[in-house]
Amino acid sequence: MAIQGIEGVLQQLQATAIQAGQMDRGAAAPGVSFASELKTAIGKISDTQQAARKQAQDFEIGVPGISLNDVLVDLQKSSISLQMGVQVRNKLVSAYQEVMNMAV
């Protein structure tokens, strides 16, 4: 299961890279705002954490069909997605501070 999940993520990343390459660099996509994209990304991180937590709880109470390796992989995915979110936040704060320090 973990390998299939990784392959799915790789395919999604490749599709996103292709779409990004095809977009015009100077024009913003119509109807897409930074705030909505940020909210969606944070929502995905939250969903990943909730799913991992639920799977861990189900494993603890002995729900059949849930293996320890699946639980550990999902918990690790959750941890990595949170770390990525924190790093993106740090870069955004750094960029904001740099813009605020520019002379007008």
Swiss-Prot record:
Family: Belongs to the FliE family.
UniProt xrefs under HAMAP family: FliE
GO CC, alphabetical: bacterial-type flagellum basal body
Pfam families hit by this protein: FliE
PANTHER family linked to this entry: FLAGELLAR HOOK-BASAL BODY COMPLEX PROTEIN FLIE (PTHR34653:SF1), PTHR34653
Annotated TM spans: none
Gene Ontology terms for molecular function: cytoskeletal motor activity; structural molecule activity
Source organism: Serratia proteamaculans (strain 568)
Lineage: Bacteria, Pseudomonadati, Pseudomonadota, Gammaproteobacteria, Enterobacterales
Domain of life: Bacteria
Protein name (record): Flagellar hook-basal body complex protein FliE
Keyword annotations of the record: Bacterial flagellum
InterPro entries: FliE
BP-aspect Gene Ontology terms: bacterial-type flagellum-dependent cell motility
Compartments it resides in: Bacterial flagellum basal body
